[in-house]
């Protein structure tokens, strides 16, 4: 018997709700007789705003509470920013589908006084706000003259902190700014040769309980094949490196004919060591490409860099 009701678990931040409501609307359009409800909640990552993300511990910071709802039967699916979803999921849960990716790039948002500048021309000591070790490490590598300061809170809160003068600029995800209607705040889309984006950035991941064919039948309309191939390669790369959402691992994927080309990067926190390589293969076997690239980077010393980082940012007791 087909499902008549679908329950969605979501974070309650403004961006999360925009994303979840988009999923809800798309599913309602595809399944007119389906009743869809949303349960919004705060996650650990939403509640702890006075500690850097990497110091809290990065496994499921923005997902555990949503997953718990599914595991006890109170939700059928959870909507995540795919970049926040760990590569190893709790037993009984699975990544059901991946939506079409929006712009995965990192974006520079400047304070009004700096609108005539860009990353390369910001003066010595300019304060850059970011909560991402990946962005921090890559930008330190290219722009060692800049100062970097942690910034927490939702997108609107971060923009308010920038506008108040606490920072000279922020680095944020272009996709998130666009979804919230702040695309006009983007002053520079940061090219991949400066900052490779996070695994899964720009896409949504729909997580669900395993062995639920009725649920899979409902959500399959959201699956975007090319995005899924790209993100599965990226997630395999991250999983094999045993990295999480808060480590300096960056990626980029692109198609050339029937080939998928994955570029990956691991950097030290100070930006002085940066290993970057690429791998390619048939787009029909994306995970093998990710595994191959991870092995290449490990052979070049990525494992040692990551161990140093894990030791340096080990969560505080």
Swiss-Prot record:
Any one Gene Ontology cellular component term annotated for this protein: cytoplasm
CDD domains with a match to the protein in the record: PBP2_HuPBGD_like
Any one Gene Ontology molecular-function term assigned to this protein's record: hydroxymethylbilane synthase activity
More about this protein: The porphobilinogen subunits are added to the dipyrromethane group.
Self-association and partners: Monomer.
HAMAP family: Porphobil_deam
SUPFAM superfamilies: Periplasmic binding protein-like II, Porphobilinogen deaminase (hydroxymethylbilane synthase), C-terminal domain
Cofactor note: Binds 1 dipyrromethane group covalently.
Family: Belongs to the HMBS family.
Species this protein is from: Synechococcus sp. (strain CC9902)
Alphabetical UniProt keywords: Chlorophyll biosynthesis, Porphyrin biosynthesis, Transferase
A Pfam family reported for this protein in Swiss-Prot or TrEMBL: Porphobil_deamC
GO terms (BP aspect): chlorophyll biosynthetic process; protoporphyrinogen IX biosynthetic process
Record PTM S-(dipyrrolylmethanemethyl)cysteine, positions in chain: 245
Name of the protein in its database record: Porphobilinogen deaminase
NCBIfam families: hemC
Stated role: Tetrapolymerization of the monopyrrole PBG into the hydroxymethylbilane pre-uroporphyrinogen in several discrete steps.
Catalytic activity: 4 porphobilinogen + H2O = hydroxymethylbilane + 4 NH4(+)
Cofactors, names only: dipyrromethane
Pathway, per record: Porphyrin-containing compound metabolism; protoporphyrin-IX biosynthesis; coproporphyrinogen-III from 5-aminolevulinate: step 2/4; Porphyrin-containing compound metabolism; chlorophyll biosynthesis
Annotated EC: 2.5.1.61
Gene coding for it: hemC
């Amino acid at each position: 018997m087909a499902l008549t009701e679908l329950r969605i678990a979501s974070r309650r931040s403004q961006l999360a709700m925009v994303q979840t409501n988009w999923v809800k609307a798309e599913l309602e359009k595809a399944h007119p007789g389906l009743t869809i409800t949303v349960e919004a909640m705060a996650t650990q990552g939403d509640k702890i705003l006075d500690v850097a993300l990497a110091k809290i511990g990065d496994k499921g910071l923005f997902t555990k509470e949503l997953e718990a709802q599914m595991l006890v039967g109170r939700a059928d699916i959870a909507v995540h920013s795919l970049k926040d979803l760990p590569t190893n999921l709790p037993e009984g849960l699975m990544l059901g589908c991946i939506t079409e990716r929006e712009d995965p790039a990192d974006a520079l948002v400047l304070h009004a006084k700096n609108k005539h500048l860009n990353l390369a021309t910001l003066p010595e000591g300019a304060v850059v706000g970011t909560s991402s070790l990946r962005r921090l490490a890559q930008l330190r590598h290219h722009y060692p003259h800049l100062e970097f300061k942690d910034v927490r809170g939702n997108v609107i809160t971060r923009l308010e902190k920038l506008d108040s003068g606490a920072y000279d600029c922020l680095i944020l995800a272009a996709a998130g700014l666009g979804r919230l209607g702040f695309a006009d705040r983007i002053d520079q889309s940061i090219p991949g040769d400066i900052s490779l984006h996070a695994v899964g950035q720009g896409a949504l991941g729909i997580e669900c309980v395993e062995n639920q064919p009725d649920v899979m039948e409902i959500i399959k309309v959201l699956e975007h094949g090319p995005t899924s191939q790209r993100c599965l390669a990226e997630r395999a790369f991250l999983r094999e490196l045993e990295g999480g959402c808060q480590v300096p691992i960056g990626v980029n994927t692109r198609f050339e004919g029937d080939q998928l080309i994955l570029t990956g990067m691991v950097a030290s926190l100070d930006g002085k060591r940066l290993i970057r390589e690429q791998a390619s293969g048939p787009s029909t076997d994306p995970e093998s490409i990710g595994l191959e690239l991870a092995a290449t980077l490990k052979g070049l010393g990525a494992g040692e860099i990551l161990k140093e980082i894990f030791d340096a940012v080990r969560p505080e007791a």
